[in-house]
A protein has these predicted regions:
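PLP-dependent amino-acid enzyme catalytic core
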Residues: 1-211
Length: 211
């Protein structure tokens, strides 16, 4: 068995790998497609996404980040990472509720935006609904396969199984997309903590958003 180390980013969260790339990709896209506009990036977070998104977009011209997190249920360290991070374009907002309530607020903002935004303003997300979050995550599945083969730990024609600690399914979805693209991935094991939200959903077909 091998462990893929994804904690070497600036906030020590695995999401740093995608959220260091995403701001630069979005800055290039804005420059080419909508120069002179301002982008507001919303993030619903249970802790890690917020600080990683804020760190990635920190002081990036033309971008403002609003990270919404549950006022109860995240660790003091996670909250401190967001609320003490220096940056002229960053704001962390506590929501009275859980992660799903924070996410519902972000989704509602996108729904309202369909009615129109002020001129020169764009709205985007730092969550996994943004394909720009998932694409960089696909890369480290490819990297893992290559590293195993370079070490001789995986025969050239063999598949690799991945066990992925899973909260909101984004990371394991990147693995599924990598497999769909032809990467020799065998089983994708959805590892859940004692909250069991996804584990219960996969076993029963019922999703309990109250947790």
């Amino acid at each position: 068995d091998y462990l893929l180390e994804l904690f070497h980013g600036p906030t020590a969260a695995f999401k740093d790998l995608a959220l260091q790339a995403l701001p630069r990709l979005m800055a290039l896209a804005r420059e080419r497609v909508a120069p002179g506009t301002r982008a507001v990036v919303l993030a619903a977070t249970s802790g890690d996404t917020g600080s990683a998104a804020m760190r990635g977009f920190r002081n990036l011209p033309g971008f403002r980040v609003l990270a919404y997190y549950p006022g109860r249920g995240i660790s003091a360290v996670q909250e401190a990472q967001m609320t003490t991070m220096a940056g002229d374009n960053l704001e962390a907002v506590a929501v009275d509720g859980n992660f799903d309530d924070a996410q519902a607020g972000v989704k509602a903002a996108f729904a309202r935006a369909r009615g129109g935004l002020p001129p020169g303003v764009l709205l985007s997300s730092a969550n996994s609904i943004n394909i720009g979050r998932l694409v960089p995550q696909i890369v480290y599945y490819v990297h893992a396969l290559r590293a195993l083969r370079r070490r001789g730990a995986l025969p050239p024609d063999a598949e690799a199984d991945f066990a992925v600690p899973t909260g909101n399914f984004g990371d394991i979805l990147a693995g599924y997309l990598a497999k769909a693209m032809g990467l020799p991935v065998g089983r994708l094991l959805c590892a859940s903590n004692r909250n069991r939200v996804l584990a219960d959903f996969l076993e029963t077909g019922v999703y309990d958003r109250r947790r």
